[in-house]
Amino acid sequence: MDRTIIAPWKAEEKEQSEKLHRKLQGLALVHPLPDELRKLIAWDMFLKPNQVAFVHVMHYLFRLLDPAEFKRRFFWPITDKKSEANFRSSTVEYLKHLNEKHQLHWANIKSYLVVMPGGMRFINFLLEFVGFVIQELIKQREKSLGLEAGTPNVSAKVMARQNAVMKEYASSYVVNLEENTALLRDKTQKIRRLMADLSADMGVPEEQLADDGFLDEFEATAALGVERVITQPTERKFDLEASLCGLKEAIDLFQVKQAENNQSKEAVEKALRGMRVLFDCDAVTEGDFYDPLGASKMDALLNGFNRISGTIAEQLDANDHYNESNAFVTTDLQALRVELSQSEVQLNNLLKKLNEPSKKDKGSANASGSARVQTLQPATPRFESVISSKFVSTPPIRIDMGGGGGRNAPVRLALQDDFNGKQFDALSNSLLAPAPPRSARKLKALDQSTGIDLNGTLNRSKINDPMQMLRTIHKNTSKVKAAPQANLSSLGSKWKQMQASFGFDEAPVPGAAVISPQTSPTDPSDPFTPLSGSECTRIERIPRTSENNTSLIAKSAAVIKVLEVSRNVLNLSTSPSGRLDALVPHTESHQQDVAPRLQLNDRTINDSLQLDPDFNIENDKNAFNVSHKFDFDQIGGEDDLQNISDSVLKDIIF
């Protein structure tokens, strides 16, 4: 058998299937297909049994034929096999109902058509059913059109007259159409000639000129050209007109102000001259401000305004910040006043504590009723026990000014004339030596240039060893030890010995001169403590380092310095303790001072000087600065002996 030859029945089946496909597509133009059926429609969909396509095609046709009947007879959509079997049985029953109702003479309605929907027989049956549905739809449409038109029954004569009129109208329409066609042909030729001319002028082919893209580009280019040539100049003219209108308004306002404030030429010249002098402007002539018509020149006025605008702006800015600066200064001054008041209160409290006498001073003042005893206020204030522990004071010195008649000779410090070089060591080892009798006293001749004659106090006093005085710093020295009385029976032998020890009988050495007191210049950068004009009590400050930052080193340095200076008994410029004036007066005026003067903290105390705690407090470096809050707990113990030169003679008993 030749497989290239197709059987005639298959060719007919294929032709019928294509015909069914075209009819379904025709129906889809008027009544769109559902989405599920649109996916299944094909020319060969029923060449083989296709149950899915059968269900969707019958659903589509039944709904077009009678939607109400379909809704009453069928259940849709199909969800399982049972509902699919019910749909097939309902389809057979509904087809039989349609066959009987419309006398369609469908003899091949059998169940196998719906059980195996495919093949030639099913395609032919489906073609007949689709034709029936189309006829029913046409009838329904004609019926609806007849109801809408409402055409009455017209006679044949009327219809003939209407037909004649329609023919004449059609004839005139044909003639008019021919004329329009000829005119359109002529215009088309003219357009072609113009396109040819444009193509020749522009060098662009006619096909490109006729292209829609080229026309769009040409239109855009033409729009840009119109904007550049017409729109932009117009906008610039509008802007210029607006600025001119604003300038005109300004000129009108200026003219109105000028009319209101019209001044004479002389007044304007005077005002401009004052402004020129005030702001240091260049010299301007009369012609620079006025033209022959008498009106002010705008450039000159603007120049003058520009000269003073900076100064005006600065002044306005200063005025704006004036209130702010005043508020700031006021706040600062209020804070300073509060701080000053607190400092004054603190200072007053401290001065009250410092000036308050102690119980011991009050008792000694009450016991001393004699007029010759004067209680001197110490230059350095008395502090509380906390402050007193931080300072080292020299021992009290008792000076008997009564003369001490008999064998009770007064006690005094050793002077230069009491010693010679070979007797210095013996004197250093002795603590107390009795004075020689009055008959054995011989004043040594001093330098005639000095002209000093010592009074009786020099020879009536006993000598205290300064080394012993330094050893009694921390001891109770309120009571002076009684000097040992010399034995009268041994005056014969011992008297000569004391005369020889003091060198009363020795002749004055030629060329010897008394050492005059020397003052040390004060230097702001001096490394010593600024306490005394003499160097005997000036303790050198030891720099704080890791090696010497101990209390032992500070104590040793201070003690060694004081001991070395105390042994310098040959210097009459100061006492061994450094607190007394030179015992040899300098001038004749000093000889009239009966009582010796004491120096407390670099101040000389006598009858004519009343101690004032505020005396020279600005330059006194020993005075406490009470402008700050004291915190004596922070004073280190390492500085106790560094301030040994700041000691105070607590008790002075005359």
Swiss-Prot record:
Stretches for region Disordered: 354-376
Lineage: Eukaryota, Metazoa, Ecdysozoa, Arthropoda, Hexapoda
Domain of life: Eukaryota
Regions of compositional bias (Polar residues) in chain numbering: 365-376
GO annotations of cellular component type: centrosome; cytoplasm; HAUS complex; kinetochore; mitotic spindle microtubule; spindle; spindle pole
Any single Pfam family the record assigns to this protein: HAUS6_N
Single biological process term from Gene Ontology: microtubule cytoskeleton organization
UniProt name for this protein: Augmin complex subunit dgt6
Gene giving rise to this polypeptide: dgt6
Keyword NAD: no
Biased composition (Basic and acidic residues): 354-363
Family: Belongs to the HAUS6 family.
Organism: Drosophila melanogaster (Fruit fly)
Main localization, broad class: cytoplasm
Additional record remark: The name 'dim gamma-tubulin 6' derives from the decreased gamma-tubulin staining of the spindle pole seen following RNAi-mediated knockdown of dgt6 in S2 cells.
Keywords: Cell cycle, Cell division, Centromere, Chromosome, Coiled coil, Cytoplasm, Cytoskeleton, Kinetochore, Microtubule, Mitosis
Annotated function: As part of the augmin complex, plays a role in centrosome-independent generation of spindle microtubules. The complex is required for mitotic spindle assembly through its involvement in localizing gamma-tubulin to spindle microtubules. dgt6 is required for kinetochore fiber formation, mediating nucleation and/or initial stabilization of chromosome-induced microtubules.
Subunit: Component of the augmin complex composed of dgt2, dgt3, dgt4, dgt5, dgt6, msd1, msd5 and wac. The complex interacts directly or indirectly with microtubules and is required for centrosome-independent generation of spindle microtubules. dgt6 interacts with CENP-meta, gamma-tubulin, msps, Ndc80, Nuf2 and tacc.
A Gene Ontology molecular function term of the record: protein-macromolecule adaptor activity
Subcellular location(s) of the protein: Cytoplasm, Cytoskeleton, Spindle; Cytoplasm, Cytoskeleton, Spindle pole; Cytoplasm, Cytoskeleton, Microtubule organizing center, Centrosome; Chromosome, Centromere
Coiled-coil regions listed: 329-356
